Amino acid sequence: MLDRAEDFLGRVTFVTGPEKHCGKTTFLNRALALVRAAGERPAFLSVGYDGEARDSLSAARKPSVPVAAGDVVVSAERFLRDGRILPEILETLPGGSAFGRICVARANRSGRIVLVGPEGNQGVSRVLSFLRDEGAARTILVDGAINRITQVASWPGARFVFVLRTDAAGLDKAARQARRLSLLSTLKPVPAGFGAGEGEVLLAGPLTAATAAALPESVRGVSVEDFTKVFLEDGELRSFLSGRALFVGTPIECAGIVAVLRGVSRQTFLSRLDEGTASRVVFNPYELSPEAAA
């Protein structure tokens, strides 16, 4: 799982994570290398700004984003030209960014680049529509914003990879995040006609702890737009599901949970998970990539 080009080919895959420096961009680079090794040239973009050498707040070194000749990449025009990739501009997107116009370009030479992409769901959807409608790329990877899985819902059929990093001090928190996300991604689509029956509620807004507590005891089923509208912690969610059914209007597929461990054994991490969550976990699949081996 997530260690073959076939896991990404012909798909739109968002790479997400709960916090900065969780390994998102490193995983993106790994996935891109797999796709290229299979003879395909992917398209990729970031939601917002990424790719600087060091984080502006922590000064921690961030991985650069390599580009191969033939790749299609989205970024500010100035960064496309600074990356020495000899870009062929395919499209200039409406609006702009703090770094100037954002463009879709095809690289004619290999290099490294700073990614600057659209900020909102509408902007992401616009880019994906262009890439698919114009036949620019069959395989698309998106470096998603921190803790914003809602962006995946901007494109029907897209899926996401959740990357988290943990050490001994953060082990329990990481396990809770993994369990919660795994459970949310298994929620079933709302049945046809749901909401018309007794004890059925179609929520227009988010499901919070306060909302859940205010539901009458007679309510046996609740539906939300998608699982990103569920704001219940792992324990709260499991308690809610023990007495009620929870459905989603738009299911979002989880392709896997990538666990980057520091000073924690794989067995120790897995011991904190239920069977369903453990089956979704991949450990550092980018430890040896085609690029690293070259």
Regions found by a protein language model. Give the residues of each.
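Short, basic, glycine/proline-bearing loop/turn elements
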Residues: 12-18, 106-118
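Short active-site-adjacent helix-start/loop capping segments
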Residues: 22-23, 51-55, 149-151, 170
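Walker A (P-loop) phosphate-binding motif
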Residues: 2-52
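Short glycine-rich, polar/acidic loop-and-turn segments at beta strand-coil junctions
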Residues: 17-19, 46-49, 78, 144-146, ...
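Conserved catalytic-core segment of NTP-binding enzymes
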Residues: 120, 124-277, 290
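N-terminal phosphate/diphosphate-binding loop that engages ATP/GTP or pyrophosphate donors
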Residues: 31-107
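N-terminal charge/polar-biased segments
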Residues: 1-9, 37-40, 270-294
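Short, glycine/acidic-enriched capping/hinge loops at junctions between secondary-structure elements
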Residues: 25-28, 53-57, 173-174, 268-270
